[in-house]
């Protein structure tokens, strides 16, 4: 027995309503209406042969499971709106189906084959709602500032949300904490959560406070209070302030605390324990890196005593080879100089002559000690550029000082003679003799002589 089935008769039964039910009541009423309606019972009769075929197929594949029908896929209202790939014809047809599913009537004929006028009306209603939702959204960030947003500027995929929104002015760290949900940022949520009584989940679910939506689309939850513009971000419930300008925190210095907890007024005094902890932490992070581990291993292997000895031996061999090659190149280098200890002071001149003959390289390498020895090198002809060494060599030419000229008996010219008053007895008897230490008697006589002289001067003046 053949059945003729139209698409309009079958498809409403395979598609569930697109918009999710907000409450359990709505869901149950919708199901009851479907079951009780004539559409549900009458449509199953012609579908009976198809159903049996599906059942046979399911039992053949899985014999343990009894007759099972695959549940039809749910269409999400938002996803359906956001999909841009769908053609206009498809969307219109789906809109009709959603309309029919959401408003089931008891009349079999009207629900399955609605008239053109009803379809057109439903289409217009849906189109108007979507257009209003997308374009005619009023944007008001704060009270008293009523802005109407331009639909051409910054409309996103999510309808009713604009890039001008305050979401973009929030710091990225807070944005991540507040708005990241299932790996995607929900645009349009308020920048600050206003009331601390509400939980975070309820505030995220509620619609944005600054976007005015049509009443048909808005949920029953009350709109959020807009936070005051002048209030700082530290007063938000998510960021509980550790310290404010009015309160003073008493910090216990016995335990080390990071500088972020310390108050502004408190002087920063670094703790030694805190510093060591930081250092240890830094070391741990360094040691964990694989590159540093490899370098440490190589250093440890190098620093072993056996390897160090080997390295020293290799260096010595290389030096000897270089020395031999240099000697072969220049014949002057072969003339070996006698050691410094074996040389007498007279032999130094001959050694110096040999040094002058030898090239600069050998001089530096072999006999560096002779160059800076006891006897400084005296150049026979002083160069134009006068160095310290040249001046030192010419020291013997410089005339000796005044002290060396005079004999030991004569007094030097540089020392000034003191004007001393000698007693008369000494002055008369020994004119040339100068006592080293004057006796007490001499001092007394000197005093008396000076007193007499003073009196005579006074008498003369009078």
Curated annotation (Swiss-Prot):
Location of the region described as Disordered in the Swiss-Prot/TrEMBL record: 104-161, 180-240, 320-462
Keywords: Centromere, Chromosome, Cytoplasm, Cytoskeleton, Kinetochore, Nucleus
GO cellular component, one term: outer kinetochore
PTM comment: Phosphorylated by cdk1 at prometaphase arrest. Phosphorylation prevents nsk1 kinetochore and spindle targeting. Dephosphorylated by clp1 at anaphase onset controls its relocalization.
Secreted listed as a keyword: no
GO biological process entries: attachment of mitotic spindle microtubules to kinetochore; centromere clustering
Record's subunit section: Interacts with dlc1. The dlc1-nsk1 complex seems to oligomerize in chain-like structures. Also binds directly to spindle microtubules.
Protein name according to UniProt: Kinetochore protein nsk1
Organism: Schizosaccharomyces pombe (strain 972 / ATCC 24843) (Fission yeast)
Organism lineage string: Eukaryota, Fungi, Dikarya, Ascomycota, Taphrinomycotina
